[in-house]
Amino acid sequence: MGNMNEAIQITDAKKRYSAGVLKYAQMGYWDGDYVPKDTDILALFRITPQEGVDAIEAAAAVAGESSTATWTVVWTDRLTACDMYRAKAYKVEPVPNNPGQYFCYVAYDLSLFEEGSITNVTASIIGNVFSFKPLKAARLEDMKFPVAYVKTFPGPPTGIVVERERLDKFGRPLLGATTKPKLGLSGRNYGRVVYEGLRGGLDFMKDDENINSQPFMHWRDRFLFVMDAVNKASAATGEVKGSYLNVTAGTMEEMYRRAQFAKELGSVIVMVDLVIGYTAIQSMSNWCRQNDMILHLHRAGHGTYTRQKNHGVSFRVIAKWMRLAGVDHIHAGTAVGKLEGDPMTVQGYYNVCRDTHTKVDLPRGIYFDQDWGALRKVMPVASGGIHAGQMHQLLDLFGDDVVLQFGGGTIGHPQGIQAGATANRVALEAMVLARNEGRDIANEGPQILRDAAKWCTPLAAALDTWGEISFNYASTDTSDYVPTPSVA
């Protein structure tokens, strides 16, 4: 791998700026002695160099191609403050138990980035390096943003504290469900599903990622029937209720139009998909802030680049970007459900969303300290293959500040949708009470649920139907680190 502290940068100006091709390390993109400044943006890449490519040179190439470099010396370098603008790879370490892979730490001067723009950050950090031929694969594992840069983002328009105040719901997770089937229902039937779920005890119902405005149900019809259901359920229960109205559309103008209509109908929350893009997400966040609306983000499409641990972008990075971009909710995994997610790694995603200051936590995949500079917190959402029988696991893993969404676990209940919602609400209330009484819910959870089911027929039916069903598959994305007394 070579001597990582070897002074290999060419400092002689005549040689450094002579026409021709130099190694990236020679051009100044590697500095093993560099100490990152408090104002630097830091990135950790997992790189897999091609056979014969030195790890340090590969790291320097990542730094170069994600900042100022091109493949050859250019004379215009002498017209800029190159020493400041060059990103610097400053540490390379072998990835434990993964031969041929290396962790590459890169520091970027803050002046390389436009303030308040996730789009600009991503254009630099992931814009070019992932298709670079000397690398077999590359993955962005983690990032650290200085407070000076964090402060250029307004962050979530509502945040956890204000959302709970608006809903008047404290001391427990929020409950939701995605309307199923997610495609094909008429507006009237869709609204009926929403009413049944909310009337049975859920706090939220939700559009799924791909329900927009299709021939079987125009978006305006859906909004009208859904909000009629929300209002009736609120009146019947005396609770503030909501339903995530998906305003995702083909243009920003259309998304604004749909969001405005949702507001006029009295909705407290709108939803967009990750696939609309970072600029559109920030634009919708600004609209929600100006209109006192909660913004829910469905992470549709993320698995195409977050799931494989040797190439792509870790979801913990996406979660950090989205907290800066300004969403109030984000789907962050369940650990026990049907979707990808190692429990420790998923807890790391939740910490990124909810911490005031995120500490290094290698078992959970957190490689950098991150001071969030009083930025509002994001409410993580657990959704996908969960049911009432897992309530003790979910509460133990994620605590109170989470939305637990039981789609099939509500709408698939043998006694109907309202009974499914009631089963989930009773399971949650029983588990929160047991926890507050000091009981060990992680181990006593199944018995707590059985005891509650004695006086709740819907919960008993849910437990009989799904029992302790879980999706026990090995996760493809786990943290790689060497256990030591400080991190084990």
From Swiss-Prot:
Residues of the signal peptide: none
Keyword match Cell inner membrane: no
Reaction catalysis annotation: 2 (2R)-3-phosphoglycerate + 2 H(+) = D-ribulose 1,5-bisphosphate + CO2 + H2O; D-ribulose 1,5-bisphosphate + O2 = 2-phosphoglycolate + (2R)-3-phosphoglycerate + 2 H(+)
Post-translational modification N6-carboxylysine, affected residues: K206
Positions bound to Mg(2+): K206, D208, E209
Entry's EC annotation: 4.1.1.39
Gene3D superfamilies to which the protein is assigned, alphabetical: Ribulose bisphosphate carboxylase, large subunit, C-terminal domain, RuBisCO large subunit, N-terminal domain
Residues the record marks as active site: K180 (proton acceptor), H298 (proton acceptor)
GO BP, sorted A to Z: reductive pentose-phosphate cycle
Cofactor note: Binds 1 Mg(2+) ion per subunit.
A GO term, aspect molecular function: ribulose-bisphosphate carboxylase activity
A Pfam cross-reference name: RuBisCO_large
Cofactor(s) demanded: Mg(2+)
Site (Transition state stabilizer): K338
Residue numbers binding substrate: N128, T178, K182, R299, H331, S383
Keywords annotated in UniProt: Calvin cycle, Carbon dioxide fixation, Lyase, Magnesium, Metal-binding, Monooxygenase, Oxidoreductase
Xref: NCBIfam families: PRK04208.1
Family assignment from sequence similarity: Belongs to the RuBisCO large chain family. Type I subfamily.
Other information: The basic functional RuBisCO is composed of a large chain homodimer in a 'head-to-tail' conformation. In form I RuBisCO this homodimer is arranged in a barrel-like tetramer with the small subunits forming a tetrameric 'cap' on each end of the 'barrel'.
Biological function: RuBisCO catalyzes two reactions: the carboxylation of D-ribulose 1,5-bisphosphate, the primary event in carbon dioxide fixation, as well as the oxidative fragmentation of the pentose substrate. Both reactions occur simultaneously and in competition at the same active site.
Assembly, per entry: Heterohexadecamer of 8 large chains and 8 small chains.
Family annotation (PANTHER family): RIBULOSE BISPHOSPHATE CARBOXYLASE, RIBULOSE BISPHOSPHATE CARBOXYLASE LARGE CHAIN
Full protein name: Ribulose bisphosphate carboxylase large chain
Organism: Variovorax paradoxus (strain S110)
